Each structure stands twice: as C-alpha cells, then as structure tokens.
Amino acid sequence: MTLIHWRVKTIFTVALAALPIFSWTGVAQTRGGPAPRPTTGSGPYKAVMEMDAGLPDHTVYRPEDMTALSGVTLPLVIWGNGACANAGNSFSNFLTDISSYGFLAIALGPIVERGAAGPAGPPAAPVPAAQPPIQQPTDTTHLPRNLPPAATHPSQIIDAIKWATGENDRAGSKFYKHVNVGKIAVMGQSCGGVQAIEVAADSRVTTAVIWNSGLFAQPSDMGGGKTLSKKDLESIHVPMAYISGDATDIAHNNANADFEYIKSIPVFRAWERGVGHGGTYNQPNGGEFAGIGVAWLNWQLKGDARAALMFRGADCGLCVNPKWVVRTKNLK
C-alpha cells in the first residue's frame, strides 16, 4: 500500500472513530418530524435536537422555547459531519452547545438511533515544542479516489440555507421572523470540513470554520461534491478559521497548508496540544472546541467585540493559552 493510499484511508477511518457508534436504523418520521429530543447546552437558551418534515435529510438544533426569544433572531450555522456521515446527531454535544447560545444549527443527515457509546478517541500526543513552524504536507502526488462515496453532499448545506430562509418567511412557522438569514456560517469536521469549503464561496455565507480538515495538495473529490484544489480557496471572500488537533491529527498539515495558501482574506489558524483528529466534540457540551466555536460565531455573526478578544491581537485569549498554537492573517 502506498503512503497516499494509507493517508486517505486513515482520514476516513479516524474520522469515523471520532464519532459515536450508531445502529443506523434511522428514525421514523411523522408529519412535522419526531418530537424534539431534550438536550441542553451551557448557554442561556436550553436547546433541543429535532427533525423537520420539510428538511428530512437534516437534523435541526434550536432553542427549545422559540416564543421566549423576544425579538432575538438566530444566526444560521450549517454543519458537515466527520466522514461526511449521514447522521445529524453524530456531533450532538457540540451542536447543542452552539445552539444554546442563540444559533439555529443544522447538521447534514437525519437523527439515527445510537448504539453503544463511541470509542474514547485517539490517545493524547506528546506536547510539541512551543510555537513550532508551520510545516507543509508531504502528500505531493495526485490522490486517487480511495473512499466509498460520501453519504452526504455539499448541496445539502445549500438546501439547509434555503429551508431556513423559507421558514423565516413562512407565517405559522416556529422560526417565523426568528432567523437572521443575513448571517450564515458553514462549518464541518474532517470530510465535512471539505464540504464546508466547497460552499463557502456562496454569496449568502458570512464565515466558514473548518475543523480538523483542509484540502489536499492535489485535487480531490473527498467531500462528495466537485473536485477541489487549493485554487478553490481563492473563490472564498469571507473570514475563515481552521481549528484542529496537534500533529497527531491526520488533517493537521492540510489545515496548515490551506492557511499558508490563503492570502487576501482574514484567516485564523489554531491547534490544541495533546488533542488529535477526534477533537473534543464528544465531551460534555462539546468541550473546548465548542467554546471556541461559540466565540467565533458570536464575533462573526453577532458582532460581539468581547468574543473577538479570543482571536484578535497578539495577546488574544488563545494566543496566551499555553495549550494552543495560533497563527493569523489579515485579522482585524
């Protein structure tokens, strides 16, 4: 097996390992979808997870009591799963926490019934030296397609945007006039991050956050959509953030290389020592990654200057945190 074949298979395998194990039986749908499933999150709005008959191939995370929003509108966050999995509850801890801070989050894929608890994730890596230089990826030859077809498609991100826009305009919808369709983030982990990159150039998108992911050095259709190359990054004109684990994260170098390639837009790159490709998503309330996600979204979608302090300036919150390594470009 060549190094490249091993690398592609490993990305797929590790991404799956980061997810809970499912029975993949699906959830029977009724008109309006199954009853919302109680979750919570650490934010001011108790969040729930549900499916909607108008968007059957997705999972919706929202504040439980929409009537209590009192004129508050929810920015929209669309999520692509690791391994491009067709399971919208595979990152439920993480997305519930984000929604609890006043966001409408929509994941690709329906709710599927959970089986046994997932694996604990990759072991902690040795702590690397402080502020190591960013290294380029070693995969410099063309990547063959060595994966089964992605179970979700980047077009489902656009479907979610259209659905949320329609529900915001539809009298009688619980989302009527409660969605800020002018503030939209696309995000995803691993393979789902590639899906987010593909649609980040859409004019409706406000920001993109790429988790444990990045494009390959050579063109690849890993996300199930079009074949993407680094040049596709030039079509993106909104602020981006790349968040990953350390060098044990199989996509660490991919994220580094994307950061180096991007020239003109604001881009934030950070990775956490001792964390691998599985991130902290399955920890209570999504762990530290969720807190970072909430802060970035509060800044980019709500204009929260206090949240910006986590990312902006030489003494930014993550910059002075010894667990994190940070690089930025054009970030103001």
Whereabouts are the PLM-identified features?
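Short amphipathic alpha-helix adjacent to the substrate-entry channel of hydrolases
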Residues: 89-112
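Primarily recognizes the serine-hydrolase "nucleophile elbow" in alpha/beta-hydrolase
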Residues: 161-235
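Short beta-strand element of the alpha/beta-hydrolase
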Residues: 71-82
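Alpha/beta-hydrolase-fold serine-hydrolase catalytic core, especially in secreted/extracellular enzymes
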Residues: 265, 274-276, 283-332
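Bacterial N-terminal signal peptides
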Residues: 11-23
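Alpha/beta-hydrolase active-site loop
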Residues: 124-181
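The feature captures the conserved acid-bearing segment of alpha/beta-hydrolase catalytic domains
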Residues: 206-283
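N-terminal cap/lid segment of alpha/beta-hydrolase-fold proteins
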Residues: 29-72
